[in-house]
Regions:
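Conserved Radical SAM active-site core
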Residues: 24-149, 153, 162-164
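Hydrophobic faces of well-ordered beta-strands that scaffold small-molecule active sites
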Residues: 55, 103, 131-133, 154-156, ...
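Alpha-helix N-cap and loop-to-helix initiation/capping positions
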Residues: 83, 110, 170-178, 213, ...
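Alpha-helix-loop-beta-strand connector modules within alpha/beta enzyme cores
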Residues: 118-130, 181-189, 259-265
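Non-cysteine beta-strand/loop elements that form the S-adenosyl-L-methionine
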Residues: 148-163, 232-241
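Anionic-ligand binding region
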Residues: 167-197
Length: 298
C-alpha cells in the first residue's frame, strides 16, 4: 500500500508499526491528530498576524524534516498531544473567540484530510475567519485539490531550487519541481493576495528562508519563481534562520545569515522586478521567536 498524501509516497501497510517519513502510520492519522500548540501567534507577516495575532495550530510530525529545522522537536514527533477531529474543530472556534485574524495551520500536510473534516465541523458551528495553510510546499497536487474551498490563504515555502541541496538538507531531491507544481495549484485555487484593512483574506504568499552560505540557492529560487509565475507574486524573504544547539549542522549552517548575505538576496529580488513582498530585520534570528511547544490551547 502506498501513502500518496505527499510526494514521499511512502510504502505503508495498515499496521500501526508501519510509520511514514512524517512520523505516523496510516492508522494513527485516521484515529487522532497530534498537536504541540494552538495559540495566538504574532511573528508571521504583518498581514497574517495583524494586531490580534494569527490563530496558529502547530501539528506534530513533518513530511520534509529539514536537518536545520527550528521546530525540530515537533517535526521529529518528540512533542505532541493526541486530539480528535471534533476537538480540532473546537480549537479553531476557540481561537476565533480569542479574536484571531485567521486559523494558521502550521506543517499540516500529513493531516490534510483530517483537517478538511475539522474545518467542515467548525464552519457548521460558526467558523468564519480565513484558513491559512502554512506548508513547506512539499505537497501532492491531488491533496491540494481536495483542499480547494477549505483553504483561503496558502503560505508555502520555496526552500530550494537546487535538487542536490534539497537532498542533502531535506532528503528530497525532487523538492524543487514538486514544490513548484504545488505552488502552481495553490495560485490556481486562490490567486494573488487580497488584503482588506491590512489583513489577508485570500491568496498566496510564497516564503523563502535564506540559509547561511547559500546565497546562490536563494538567487536560483528567485529565478525559478519569476520564470514560473512572473513578477506579480508576493515573496516573503526571511533572514530568521536560527542554528539550534544540539543539532548536527553541515557546512555553514552553524551560524546565522550575515547582513551582507541577506542584502545580496534582497537586491537580487529587486533587480528581478519583484516589488510585492516582505523582508525582515536582524532581530528575527533569535530562539525567542520560536514558540514554546507546551500544549497551550490543545
Amino acid at each position: 500500500m502506498k501513502c500518496d498524501i505527499c510526494p514521499r509516497e511512502c510504502k505503508l501497510n495498515n499496521d500501526v508499526s508501519a510509520v511514514g517519513f512524517c512520523g505516523f502510520s496510516l492508522i494513527e492519522r485516521e484515529k487522532e491528530i497530534k498537536l504541540a500548540r494552538a495559540a495566538l501567534h504574532f511573528y508571521e507577516e504583518p498581514c497574517i498576524s495583524g494586531q490580534n495575532g494569527s490563530g496558529a495550530v502547530f501539528f506534530s510530525g513533518c513530511n520534509l524534516r529539514c536537518v536545520f529545522c527550528q521546530n525540530h522537536n515537533i517535526a521529529n514527533c518528540k512533542v505532541g498531544k493526541a486530539v480528535s477531529i471534533e476537538r480540532l474543530a473546537d480549537i479553531f472556534l476557540e481561537l476565533q473567540e480569542k479574536k484571531a485574524h485567521n486559523i494558521n495551520l502550521v506543517t499540516p500536510s500529513h493531516y490534510a484530510y483530517q483537517i478538511i473534516n475539522a474545518i467542515k465541523l467548525a464552519r457548521g458551528k460558526g467558523l468564519n475567519i480565513p484558513i491559512v495553510y502554512n506548508t513547506s510546499a512539499y505537497d501532492s497536487v491531488e491533496t491540494l485539490k481536495a483542499l480547494e474551498g477549505y483553504v483561503d490563504v496558502y503560505l508555502p515555502d520555496y526552500k530550494y531550487a537546487d535538487s542536490k541541496l534539497a537532498g542533502e538538507l531535506s532528503r528530497a531531491e525532487n523538492y524543487p519541481d514538486k514544490a513548484i507544481e504545488a505552488i502552481r495549484e495553490m495560485i490556481h485555487q486562490v490567486g494573488m493576495p487580497v488584503v482588506e484593512n491590512g489583513i489577508i483574506k485570500s491568496g498566496v504568499i510564497i516564503r523563502h528562508l535564506v540559509l547561511p552560505g547559500n546565497v546562490r540557492n536563494s538567487k536560483a529560487v528567485i529565478d525559478r519563481l519569476v520564470s514560473e509565475f512572473g513578477t506579480d507574486i508576493t515573496l516573503s524573504i526571511m533572514n530568521q534562520y536560527t542554528p539550534i544547539e544540539g543539532l548536527e549542522l553541515p557546512g555553514e549552517l552553524g551560524r546565522t545569515v550575515t547582513e551582507r548575505e541577506y542584502n545580496k538576496v534582497l537586491d537580487y529580488a529587486f533587480d528581478k522586478g519583484l516589488v510585492n513582498g516582505f523582508f525582515q530585520d536582524g532581530e528575527t534570528c533569535k530562539e525567542s521567536f520560536i514558540p514554546a511547544f507546551d500544549y497551550e490551547g490543545v
